[in-house]
Amino acid sequence: FDRFAHCLETGLYRAGQMITPSPFLTAFNFNDFAIQRYAPGSQGISVHRDGKRYQHIVVIATLAGNSRLFAANSRDGLQRRMINDRPGRIVLLSAPLFAGRKSEIARPLHGVDRVHGGRLSLGLRIKTP
């Protein structure tokens, strides 16, 4: 697992350095890991923003299952944009400090619904003290 996290850290940071200006002000290390398991038929998780304590970037890797990860324009979730998170794909969400973003715009509203047959995902984040 440490190798996986290190490869993501290194790869994302290097890719960011190829962009002018780089979206990453400094190198980073993932230090917060969460496994999310949704049972078959689960309601998922309602529209939310990741906590302010997370910075730079949030990585979500869906390992198994079928569901809908979506971004929303508002907490009511009426306008949803599907994010392809089928197993094997990695989703990147911005967090404060990514590309100089601050405040709420840095933390996109998102949620999970339409869980069919369960869902297993891994989240990697950079938590500030």
Regions found by a protein language model. Name each.
Residues 1-40:
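Signature of the catalytic double-stranded beta-helix
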Residues 23, 49-50, 58-59, 80-82, ...:
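A generic local secondary-structure boundary/capping motif
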Residues 37-40, 51-68:
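Short, conserved beta-strand element in jelly-roll/cupin
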Residues 30-32, 58, 66, 119:
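Extracellular structured ligand-interaction cores
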Residues 28, 53-54, 76, 105:
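Short solvent-exposed loop/turn micro-motifs enriched in small/polar/acidic residues
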Residues 43-47, 106-109:
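A short, acidic/glycine-rich surface segment
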Residues 41-44, 94:
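Short Pro/Gly-enriched beta-strand edge/turn motifs at strand-loop
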Residues 70-129:
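Catalytic core of Fe(II)/2-oxoglutarate
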